């Protein structure tokens, strides 16, 4: 269990969050309608909101990654988890910051999704490496922001993306 469900709002980097890390200020009217009391969220309410959020995220991934349907379950889980935590636009490199923390990551994923055999495996391995470690323009290696804030999650998702 990487993160549990929190019934009571708590402070984090997004302000106040509740449930499975839902920033209260960013809950949509549709999502808020599923919650009786945002100050004491029930697990079934949080699960309903989570389903909406994940369904939207998956639809976006399907639109943006050609061959999404060929990606194996564990690898999809890793990509979905990463996108849920960091924002799908950041993972897909379509946000204003253009995925500055892993500049080659999504390129490897997209190429792997339409490749086969050893090439596919090699590309997923490269993408998994990018989750953890990057190289700057001067050739210096550094840990990604994601790894630094949630190392256990990053390492687990790294293994899943590798197909292990």
Residue ranges: model-predicted function:
Residues 2-5, 16:
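N-terminal mature-domain "stem" immediately C-terminal to a signal peptide or N-terminal signal-anchor/transmembrane
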Residues 5-10, 62-76, 124-130:
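Surface-exposed patches in mature extracellular/periplasmic domains of secreted proteins
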Residues 10, 20, 24-26, 70-73, ...:
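Generic structural "secondary-structure junction" signal
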Residues 12-34, 54:
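Substrate-binding/active-site groove segments that recognize
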Residues 18, 79-80, 127:
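Residue-level detector of buried hydrophobic side-chain packing
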Residues 32-67, 73-91, 99-111:
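Alpha-helical segment that forms one wall of the substrate-binding/catalytic cleft
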Residues 51, 88-164:
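Long, amphipathic alpha-helical surface segments
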């Amino acid at each position: 269990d990487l993160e549990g469900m929190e019934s009571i709002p708590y402070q984090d980097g997004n302000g106040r969050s509740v449930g499975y890390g839902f920033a209260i200020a960013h809950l949509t009217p549709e999502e808020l309608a599923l919650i009786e009391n945002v100050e004491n969220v029930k697990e079934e309410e949080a699960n309903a909101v989570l389903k909406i959020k994940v369904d939207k995220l998956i639809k976006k991934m399907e639109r943006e990654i050609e061959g999404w349907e060929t990606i194996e379950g564990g690898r999809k889980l890793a990509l979905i988890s990463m996108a849920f935590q960091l924002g799908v636009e950041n993972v897909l490199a379509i946000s204003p910051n253009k995925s500055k923390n892993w500049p080659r990551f999504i390129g490897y994923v997209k190429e792997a999704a339409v490749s086969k055999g050893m090439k596919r495996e090699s590309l997923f391995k490269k993408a998994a490496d990018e989750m953890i470690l990057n190289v700057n323009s001067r050739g210096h290696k550094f840990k990604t922001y994601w790894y630094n804030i949630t190392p256990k999650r990053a390492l687990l998702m790294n293994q899943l993306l590798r197909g292990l």
